[in-house]
Amino acid sequence: MARCERLRGAALRDVLGRAQGVLFDCDGVLWNGERAVPGAPELLERLARAGKAALFVSNNSRRARPELALRFARLGFGGLRAEQLFSSALCAARLLRQRLPGPPDAPGAVFVLGGEGLRAELRAAGLRLAGDPSAGDGAAPRVRAVLVGYDEHFSFAKLREACAHLRDPECLLVATDRDPWHPLSDGSRTPGTGSLAAAVETASGRQALVVGKPSPYMFECITENFSIDPARTLMVGDRLETDILFGHRCGMTTVLTLTGVSRLEEAQAYLAAGQHDLVPHYYVESIADLTEGLED
């Protein structure tokens, strides 16, 4: 049972010694805004030298995989391959490739509520986008899925159009994630994809398929490409309701870092209330603290 214990000393060495790999969330874990968390790049280098696999799982749907890889490099995280990066945008593209209804000779289109990074990921997967000039001439393909991602230009008109498509019972409703809000550098909040998805669900009367954390579907995307034993894998994140719940659902050892959204007091409150799926096994002040558990 998870007890939210501080990870240090002999326990830290034991946990990292048994682990074959680590899954990291990105925002609030590796970096905040345009600044890497102090010591985070060095930790990843040490993990690589120790032969521990590191993979990265983000609910952020704003960047396609190549752009996300560039951000890692810009913030000082060198030596990583794009194949190590898994975003909710990438996983949404995979799900739509698998489940988009319609005959093979008449593939349907996806109506996207989201930015250019999400659209680029879908195009890279060979999907057609509603209203996309790149779809070519001729009759517009039938919309067979509505995808809700992070959309800074969300509007009533977009909501109305999404609902019109969803009147077709065969049209899928997919959301990249349910993060309700995101913190800003000034301490305020901005609405997240979860808020937009809730609006579409309420207005359409439909329930979205969610691909991002805490959905195990994201873990399925990872295990399609990497051989992972969840019992010997750590999930390190900053958000109890997404990262830690995701880790528990997938059978991993969970570690909360306090450099992001969730506070230690919240985890302790969940522990007192018996909501153990939201309680991390361990916590650290920063992921840089994990370096002490690795042998030179």
Swiss-Prot record:
Endpoints of the signal sequence: none
Keywords: Cell membrane, Cell projection, Cytoplasm, Cytoskeleton, Hydrolase, Magnesium, Membrane, Metal-binding, Pyridoxal phosphate
Any one Gene Ontology cellular component term annotated for this protein: cytoplasm
Active site: 25 (nucleophile), 27 (proton donor)
Cofactor annotation comment: Divalent metal ions. Mg(2+) is the most effective.
Species for this entry: Homo sapiens
Protein name in UniProt: Chronophin
UniProt lineage: Eukaryota, Metazoa, Chordata, Craniata, Vertebrata
Function of the molecule: Functions as a pyridoxal phosphate (PLP) phosphatase, which also catalyzes the dephosphorylation of pyridoxine 5'-phosphate (PNP) and pyridoxamine 5'-phosphate (PMP), with order of substrate preference PLP > PNP > PMP and therefore plays a role in vitamin B6 metabolism. Also functions as a protein serine phosphatase that specifically dephosphorylates 'Ser-3' in proteins of the actin-depolymerizing factor (ADF)/cofilin family like CFL1 and DSTN. Thereby, regulates cofilin-dependent actin cytoskeleton reorganization, being required for normal progress through mitosis and normal cytokinesis.
